[in-house]
């Protein structure tokens, strides 16, 4: 059984765990030769859609392609494997005084979040994760390998920043990290009687706060 997110799970017939790009190409070839098999691509398994798993099909688990590498210290350019978890990225960048905006939970995989947007606690000041994406390497459905950036395959680069799951399998990404010093975090609880009034007040506070402050709201019964 392969869990997809907090609510979904699946029982795929076959799970492949590539360790390099060549094995990803081979896996794509297998999927192409067996079109009757549903295909899921799994980085961390937290996608809300649940498409990273299935029942009876093929799941390509990218978890072993989890490298975190500083490419260029001066420009803070970092290369990440799609299977890396954001907690590991944060731990690797912390000694440099850097961070990448990466959602709100460390167990999320790089591949899914970085191709879908990436809204997190640093977003108001440093932008979405895709705003800092500089390049992505992909394996396409025909097994070919391409690199997408503003200079190479710019139309693919435009699309991979938000719709990457529709284009191919990302095998690595290059992202510019941001210099981040001390970070403050607080979680507050409120007993709310007038929900409409509270939401209006929260909206005013969130939008008027300094850009260094990001506010999230979770409501429950």
Predicted regions and their residues:
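Short, structural beta-strand-to-alpha-helix junction motif
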Residues: 20, 76-77, 84-91, 107-110
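Short active-site loop/helix that positions an aromatic residue
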Residues: 27, 89-95
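General beta-strand structural signal in soluble alpha/beta enzymes
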Residues: 17, 39-43, 60, 70-71, ...
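Structural signature of FAD isoalloxazine-binding scaffolds in flavoprotein oxidoreductases
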Residues: 17, 49-66, 122-141, 169-172
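Short glycine/serine-rich loop/turn segments
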Residues: 5-9, 49-58, 93, 99, ...
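C-terminal cap/substrate-recognition region of VAO/PCMH-type FAD-linked oxidoreductases
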Residues: 99, 136-221
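Short coil/turn connectors at secondary-structure junctions
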Residues: 10-12, 34-37, 54-57, 65-66, ...
């Amino acid at each position: 059984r392969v869990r997809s997110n907090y609510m979904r799970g699946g029982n795929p017939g076959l799970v492949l765990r590539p360790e390099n790009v060549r094995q990803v190409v081979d896996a794509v070839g297998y999927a192409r030769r067996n079109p009757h098999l549903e295909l899921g691509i799994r980085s961390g398994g937290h996608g809300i859609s649940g498409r990273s798993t299935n029942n009876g099909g093929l799941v390509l688990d990218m978890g072993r392609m989890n490298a975190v590498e500083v490419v260029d210290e001066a420009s803070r350019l970092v290369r990440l494997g799609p299977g890396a978890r954001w907690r590991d990225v944060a731990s690797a960048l912390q000694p440099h005084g850097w961070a990448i905006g990466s959602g709100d939970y460390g167990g999320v995989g790089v591949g899914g979040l970085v191709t879908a947007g990436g809204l997190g606690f640093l977003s108001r000041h440093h932008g979405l994760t895709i705003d800092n994406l500089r390049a992505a390497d992909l394996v396409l459905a025909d097994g070919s390998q391409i690199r997408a950036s503003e200079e190479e395959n710019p139309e693919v680069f435009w699309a991979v920043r938000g719709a990457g799951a529709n284009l191919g399998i990302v095998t690595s990404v290059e992202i510019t990290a941001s210099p981040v010093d001390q970070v403050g975090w607080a979680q507050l609880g409120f007993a709310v009687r007038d929900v409409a009034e509270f939401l209006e007040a929260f909206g005013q506070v969130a939008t008027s706060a300094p850009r260094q402050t990001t506010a999230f709201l979770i409501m429950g019964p």
